[in-house]
Amino acid sequence: GLDFEVIDHSGAPSGGRHIVFLNPWGSPYTASTKAFKLCLDEGLKSIAFTKSRKITELMYSWLIDASPENEGLVSSYRAGFLPAERREIEQRLFSGELNGVISTSALELGVDIGGLDACILAGYPGSIASTWQRAGRTGRQRQDAVIILVGLKDALDQYFMRHPDDFFARNHEAVVIDASNAAILKQHIPCASAEIYLRAGDFVYDTQALAPVITELETSGLLKQGKTGDIWFSQQRYPQREVSIRGIGKIFNIFSGGRRIGEISGARIFKEAHPGAVYLHKGRQYIVQELDLENFTIHCKEADISYYTQAITSEETEIIKEVLKKDNINWGELRTTHRVTGYWRKKLLTQEKIDRYPVELPSWTFNTQGLWVILGSNLKQIVEKNNLNFAGGLHAFEHAAISALPLPLFAMCDKGDIGGISYPLYPQLLPPAIFIYDGYEGGIGLTKRGLEVIGEWLEAAKKIITDCPCEDGCPSCVQDPQCGSGNDPLDKKAAILILEEIKAYVPEKL
């Protein structure tokens, strides 16, 4: 064989890159749209990356409203588009027929879209690796390129806006995976066994450790045991066709007037396609009329409206198994239950709330991994003696902790990968408790890794709260725009007091 050779730098062609950190006073999405339009006006082939499908469509709509001449020359792009639509956009972008595209992470890698001159990042992508991957879409023909990172009113974004040196000093993160995640294994094993059957004693797959999953797959008809009893193979020829690489969950097809216009899966079905929800697709607006859970379909009608919708959610957490314990810090298996209870209608241009509507939908539940902090019963008295809101302090601390976790992990982790819930009185334990959990079925090891750096994690949370000059809490420190309870209650000063109490008895590492 040949000797290995270390490749420790990129050999890809690249010009100079001019990086701008933009922290607007007003809406960061409006600023991102204006920056994108400015680049187009200057003749720069441009791409804008957003952090959600809804913002992708909103920015596209705002751009076309502000500059109708760009219609047909710019497109939105995201998961949920039909395959033929995505291929057409990719081809038009590569050929130069399109001057720009507004995309989710769907165009971050894996698709050749040619050389671009400008990249607008509508929010910190969640990791250093993703930031440079997206920025790397520009300057591939050795021309200079501009990258504009627009800070959202979000704790992690504002941390880097205040500490740009920390951003540029950071290396690419490690990838955190959990190879024993049962939800992933149930999809992976049939695919693997369709290529090469599983054999008892295999050095790649520990069939003894995988026995419970293999048995379940046999029972459901996805795996078949060979006559010798020591091999297993897939019952389907192409099981990978049934697996979504973007997440775990059944795909629902979206129809308008009998025509299929898109698809959606996972928890997004309830959050973005409930009756009354506004579904945005390539600048067009549709109102969801029916969510058919039995036939995995969503029916909507096109509408011309001046608002969009945001789901209101509730959640509960149940302790299934305590695996690790150190003083008041615990880690183990949790079951989380989520429900969409209603939705806000918001003005399209200003994002102001118009009104609120209730909805009746089933809940969805998944088991995961997480940690929980049991707080002393006297802490409530200490907080309230200072005329502060105890429940608001717990809630604010939970938000700050979720935002801060990616900072000390040095692992690929976005705050959207983590969930949390706080209880002034937790029914299973009675004392107050705060839970932080992996936002994926079965868990992927994020919170477990967080335990290893819990001292740094708490310090990062404190820095996010205390660095922000606001008095009562804002989106830059303890508010979360995606909070299911609408950031109510929140108390920034109480969060600082609670954090200091927790730090007093939490070891640097567990």
Model-assigned labels for residue ranges:
Residues 1-198, 202-239, 248-249:
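Helicase motor core with emphasis on the C-terminal RecA-like subdomain
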Residues 23, 67, 405-407, 423, ...:
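Intrinsic-disorder/low-complexity coil detector
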Residues 68-70, 384-385, 508-509:
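Short, glycine- and charge-enriched coil/turn segments that flank and shape catalytic ligand pockets
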Residues 145-147, 153-171, 188-200, 210, ...:
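Extended Lys/Arg-rich polyanion-binding regions
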Residues 468, 473-477:
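Short cysteine clusters
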Residues 480:
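Cys/His-rich metal-chelating microdomains
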Residues 483-484:
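Short, non-ligating residues that shape and space the ligands of small metal-coordination modules
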Residues 501-510:
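Acidic, low-complexity intrinsically disordered tails
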